[in-house]
Amino acid sequence: MNPFSSESAWLCLTATAVLGGMLLCKAWSSGQLRSQVVCLAGLWGGACLLSLSLLCSLFLLSVSCFFLLYVSSSDQDLLPVDQKAVLVTGADSGFGHALAKHLDKLGFTVFAGVLDKEGPGAEELRKNCSERLSVLQMDVTKPEQIKDVHSEVAEKIQDKGLWAVVNNAGVLHFPIDGELIPMTVYRKCMAVNFFGAVEVTKVFLPLLRKSKGRLVNVSSMGAMIPFQMVAAYASTKAAISMFSAVIRQELAKWGVKVVTIHPGGFQTNIVGSQDSWDKMEKEILDHFSKEIQENYGQEYVHTQKLALPVMREMSNPDITPVLRDIQHAICAKNPSSFYCSGRMTYLWICFAAYSPISLLDYILKNYFTPKLMPRALRTAS
């Protein structure tokens, strides 16, 4: 019997096509296309596995499209800026710098926390932004500076409350095997990327609770995917992602929404310059033991610097997707719990989560392994 001979089947097919088309168009315009497609593909695959009839499958998909369209529509409802105040950490450069300028143009009162108040990034913010933006000295590894910023912010906003905190400050390290990364680097990454964000969160939560606002933590796709050579960085980003997931539930009763941003590869200053990599290389070599020297060799470390131009070339120079997602997290009436910013980021994270570990390791090993092997392995071969 032809499955399309009944009027019910044609009705379900038409409803699925119309609702699905509307959903995909809306998802495309909002930048959330990947998640919607994966969701619908999963539903279709599940229907096939359950051996449902075509009519039942189409009915399931049409209902799902309607539900996702409803959720997608509600997610697009934006709250008025209305002089809301936002604190952004790590605003010297990169995402934080661009975000501070972007929010200022939208009409927010912006508190831009910078590592160096007299640096070029801070000076550019003062020069190019409105009087609504304040540049504040804020090294997130120094509790006294965090408290000073809190006092200044509380004094300026008075009874308005602080609408959002964006924990963006972060550091990367020289890309090398986890065994070779000095403990000082592990501690620095943890101090900035995790403990700094946690302390900022704890200090400013009373202000967020007052406004029932937003806490936005910038993590990384590296928190979800075990890329080689970034053991210290990825571990800290995984920590902030889990911290965000836990306090998202804890703060819900206070009306505070917690959002995690997982950017893919973008060109920012976090990658560092040739000079900074030279210093990091020297630090690694200074910590070499005799056994490490025999097994790896200095040339193995030196060749990792060749990855710098490759990393930049593979990264997206347009950080608009990240700014768009953070803006949505701050402004949307019903923001998502997490955003995956960038090309293929969501699909990569889904693949890492659901593929067999052996397959994931094989792909990562073959596509992200240094060309030069350690000295001992080269000698053995």
Swiss-Prot record:
Subunit structure comment from the entry: Homodimer.
Tissue expression summary: Highly expressed in the placenta, and in the small intestine, and liver.
GO molecular function, one term: estradiol 17-beta-dehydrogenase [NAD(P)+] activity
Catalyzed reaction equations: 17beta-estradiol + NAD(+) = estrone + NADH + H(+); testosterone + NAD(+) = androst-4-ene-3,17-dione + NADH + H(+); 17beta-hydroxy-5alpha-androstan-3-one + NAD(+) = 5alpha-androstan-3,17-dione + NADH + H(+); (20S)-hydroxypregn-4-en-3-one + NAD(+) = progesterone + NADH + H(+)
Coiled coil: none
TM regions (residue ranges): 4-24
Annotated family: Belongs to the short-chain dehydrogenases/reductases (SDR) family.
Protein's job: Catalyzes the NAD-dependent oxidation of highly active 17beta-hydroxysteroids, such as estradiol (E2), testosterone (T), and dihydrotestosterone (DHT), to their less active forms and thus regulates the biological potency of these steroids. Oxidizes estradiol to estrone, testosterone to androstenedione, and dihydrotestosterone to 5alpha-androstan-3,17-dione. Also has 20-alpha-HSD activity.
Membrane topology: Single-pass type II membrane protein
Species in which this protein is naturally found: Rattus norvegicus (Rat)
Active-site residues (renumbered): Y233 (proton acceptor)
Keywords: Endoplasmic reticulum, Lipid biosynthesis, Lipid metabolism, Membrane, NAD, Oxidoreductase, Signal-anchor, Steroid biosynthesis, Transmembrane, Transmembrane helix
GO cellular component, one term: intracellular membrane-bounded organelle
Record-linked InterPro entries: NAD(P)-bd_dom_sf (IPR036291), Sc_DH/Rdtase_CS (IPR020904), SDR_fam (IPR002347)
Chief subcellular location: endoplasmic reticulum
Top-level taxon: Eukaryota
PANTHER family: 17-BETA-HYDROXYSTEROID DEHYDROGENASE TYPE 2, SHORT-CHAIN DEHYDROGENASE/REDUCTASE FAMILY 9C
Biological-process GO terms, alphabetical: androgen biosynthetic process; androgen metabolic process; bone development; cellular response to metal ion; estrogen biosynthetic process; in utero embryonic development; placenta development; response to retinoic acid
Binding positions (NAD(+)): 83-112
Location of this chain's protein in the cell: Endoplasmic reticulum membrane
Broad enzyme group: oxidoreductase
Keyword Methyltransferase: no
Pfam families named in the record: adh_short
Name the record gives this protein: Estradiol 17-beta-dehydrogenase 2
Residues binding substrate, per UniProt: S220
Stored PROSITE patterns: ADH_SHORT
